[in-house]
Amino acid sequence: MKTKLFPTILATVISLTSFAQDVVFKALASSGDATIERSSTPGVYDPIKMGTPVYKNDKIIMGANGYLGLTSTAGKTVQLKGEGIYPVNDLSGDLNADQSDIASKYIAYIFDGMKKESSSISSNMSLTGSVERSLGNAGINLFLPESTKIKSDKVSTINWIANEDATSYKIVLLNLFDEEVYSAEIKGNSAEINFGALGLSADEIYKLSVKDNNNQKVHSGVVTLQILDGEELNKVNTDFAAIEAAAPGDDAISNLVKASFYEQNGMYMEAVEYFEKAIKAAPDVEQYKIVYENFKNKTGINGEL
């Protein structure tokens, strides 16, 4: 009985001791040379990996090409780039928890996505192919899933990938009665649409497609767009404002949080926009690429912009 009780007591003491330590950050992603010197073990430098806890009084040592993304217990984010020694107490000095609950939710979602091994991406490739065929692509692949919600008050960028470049394309938006609501001739492989200027009806469905302006046989599949109604639009705008307050700026983590917010709300057009910004902000961080690839495979988006 005593021999069994002692390990249990010891485990409990260790557990309580661990919780007693002040966790300030957790490592979200890293690349290059990033190590940590614990205040409890000075002179020992351990590599920082995804999920590594960072405590008060620790020091982070970054190499010249290092990158480290940290998330705080309050839902704030910090990114370190370039060579230097960073005392954790200095990094955490101006953190606060205001308006961070909703950001913490999406940071947790991102962190969970990063835990997925790259092998899971390969296993989902068959799903990607089946979605592409269901869209009826014929030479043009819209960089969107087969359906997405959109805000009626936003200017959005539509991207596509063509098997062979055309001199010009025509982008067309139809209502459910196949009446043309909007069309434009475009040179290049992207177009901006000001949905707010089109007078689209809330909670209605519209159909978007792109075709070669000189060859009607070359076209994309049809993507259905659902316009958010007033109540849902107000909630999305309110929640997004809270996220922007908690994760301001145009850095990689802030953009990932915003991308994940739109993904969870079924607004994939906006999600793509922020995922692309995140990857451009930290192009060498493989963990961020895995999150984006998982998103594309889940939604059936093909290719790379």
Give the label of every model feature segment:
Residues 21-42, 63-68, 73-76, 82-84, ...:
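Glycine- and acidic-residue-biased ligand/ion/polar-headgroup-sensing regions
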Residues 1-29:
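Bacterial Sec-dependent N-terminal signal peptides
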Residues 42-47, 78-79, 177-185:
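Surface-exposed loop/edge segments in extracytoplasmic proteins
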Residues 51, 57, 65, 83, ...:
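Beta-strand-connecting loops/turns
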Residues 244-305:
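Alpha-helical protein-protein interaction scaffolds
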Residues 111-112, 116-245:
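Long, contiguous interaction/recruitment modules in multidomain scaffold/adaptor proteins
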Residues 41-56, 195:
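N-terminal post-signal-peptidase region of extra-cytosolic proteins
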